[in-house]
């Protein structure tokens, strides 16, 4: 599992960003507050929640651990 990514933000298109880490670009879905806090061309650290499915490998990125923890709590709620 990927827990954290640190690299340069090379592309932003709400709600996704692409963060480059040693030549590999990771596409990360972000909530609006996180999207607004990362700057194009600057380094960023994102705390990751990874979802692996048969047809997809999704990365959800958050500016801090607390946002990620809240997201994980919401996933446990029935119907969400």
Give residue spans per PLM region.
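Long, highly charged, low-complexity intrinsically disordered interaction regions
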Residues: 2, 6, 10-80
């Amino acid at each position: 599992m990927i827990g954290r990514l640190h690299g340069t933000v090379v592309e932003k298109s709400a709600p996704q960003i692409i963060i480059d880490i040693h030549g590999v670009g990771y596409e990360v879905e972000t909530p609006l507050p996180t999207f607004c806090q990362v700057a194009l061309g600057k380094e960023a650290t994102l705390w990751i929640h990874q979802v692996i499915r048969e047809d997809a490998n999704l990365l959800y990125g958050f500016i801090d651990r607390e946002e990620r923890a809240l997201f994980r709590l919401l996933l446990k709620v029935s119907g969400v």
